[in-house]
Amino acid sequence: MEGQDEVSAREQHFHSQVRESTICFLLFAILYVVSYFIITRYKRKSDEQEDEDAIVNRISLFLSTFTLAVSAGAVLLLPFSIISNEILLSFPQNYYIQWLNGSLIHGLWNLASLFSNLCLFVLMPFAFFFLESEGFAGLKKGIRARILETLVMLLLLALLILGIVWVASALIDNDAASMESLYDLWEFYLPYLYSCISLMGCLLLLLCTPVGLSRMFTVMGQLLVKPTILEDLDEQIYIITLEEEALQRRLNGLSSSVEYNIMELEQELENVKTLKTKLERRKKASAWERNLVYPAVMVLLLIETSISVLLVACNILCLLVDETAMPKGTRGPGIGNASLSTFGFVGAALEIILIFYLMVSSVVGFYSLRFFGNFTPKKDDTTMTKIIGNCVSILVLSSALPVMSRTLGITRFDLLGDFGRFNWLGNFYIVLSYNLLFAIVTTLCLVRKFTSAVREELFKALGLHKLHLPNTSRDSETAKPSVNGHQKAL
């Protein structure tokens, strides 16, 4: 009888492992297909290339797609875990959700951590070096020579990074155990290195997210149709049509020898056509789209941003009075045993919305920073090297998103797998400083955003607008006379 029970337990464990592997494969396959379509939408359409370059580009494309799929999985990790916990609480004995259990969720967290390390330290460096390699001098040109050069570059890069990490760990901890841990690569150095990368990702999120939260209002304003208050769209369309016709006549009258003027006029004509298209779209929009959707979206963004800042402020107070508020504090009751949100399913849904909102804001803020402005992908005109850089950046941001969400108190869901083992998560001063900086910087960015109009008027009243300050430089560019002599006041 005991032998039959043992066999039955082994069979059940085997079926459970097969089921979890199948679910993980299907989820990743869906993310991979979506990521492939996203990258091919932005990737520059390559010209006729040699077979060797085509193979290299194809391999780099597959590796970049894999990395972007892992990034999407890391973003969905925390929301999927939160909603799974609430579903297991609401339907504990339901036959159709038996596949959803703690073992599956723990497995997803472990796979996300493993693949993030693999992409960050192996696949993306390999894709970059493979794309830039030409083979060592003296060797026969071909795929093998490029692979050999890539592997040598990866080996040198690994030695350099491990040396830097070993020196940093030895400086931080002078204990003999830290010196001897050089021989324990898997147990110490890779987790320590990923902990450093996670901290850098959280610092990058700390820089990008507040900027993105304030920038989201501008981005949504560009995507939506604004209300036409005290505006005559017909007159504006008539003026822009005259300007378009004037530019077209000037282009037809210029000779082909004046190449510089032709290119300048073509660019000006393209800008005028774009502006005309936007005005026509605003004119064709329905009344409810103009007068209801835009204000509702702006109010929704303001509410989400305010709730995020309030949650961070509450988390700061909890950190000061309760040590269990630390991200690396005591372990929770486990998945499916208790709700981690005060308001149950509604609170969990709000947490998921805020997590996605913070991720979108961080991406918007990342591409809004001047230092990363050249990284912005363009449709059908993004080189493979730039795609690799974008995939690495998105991977760093998405891998740090669960850590940032837990550190800021957006959710109380415990970090699973290697995400909850970072040493700096147990440092009270680092966590408290992170929360304070996020709240202060976000508040300052929002105040700067909503007081920009008043500030510009004060600058003009005091005569400071002539100093070419950052806020007034954009206005001066938009008010610059166009090529045909008309002032662009639209």
UniProtKB/Swiss-Prot annotation:
Tissues where this protein is expressed: Widely expressed with strongest expression in heart and pancreas.
Secretion signal span: none
Coiled coil stretches, renumbered: 250-287
Subcellular location: Membrane
Parts of the chain that traverse the membrane: 20-40, 63-83, 111-131, 152-172, 188-208, 292-312, 340-360, 384-404, 427-447
Superkingdom, taxonomy of origin: Eukaryota
UniProt topological domain (Extracellular) ranges: 1-19, 84-110, 173-187, 313-339, 405-426
InterPro entries: LIMR, LMBR1-like_membr_prot
GO BP of this protein: embryonic digit morphogenesis; signal transduction
Spans within the Cytoplasmic topological domain: 41-62, 132-151, 209-291, 361-383, 448-490
Record-level Gene Ontology MF annotations: transmembrane signaling receptor activity
UniProt entry keywords in alphabetical sequence: Coiled coil, Membrane, Receptor, Transmembrane, Transmembrane helix
CC terms in the record's Gene Ontology section: plasma membrane
Membrane protein topology class: Multi-pass membrane protein
PANTHER family xref list: LIMB REGION 1 PROTEIN HOMOLOG, LIPOCALIN-1 INTERACTING MEMBRANE RECEPTOR LIMR
UniProt family annotation: Belongs to the LIMR family.
Recorded disease: Preaxial polydactyly 2: Polydactyly consists of duplication of the distal phalanx. The thumb in PPD2 is usually opposable and possesses a normal metacarpal.
Function as written in the Swiss-Prot or TrEMBL entry: Putative membrane receptor.
Protein name: Limb region 1 protein homolog
Species for this entry: Homo sapiens
Lineage summary: Eukaryota, Metazoa, Chordata, Craniata, Vertebrata
Gene name of the record: LMBR1
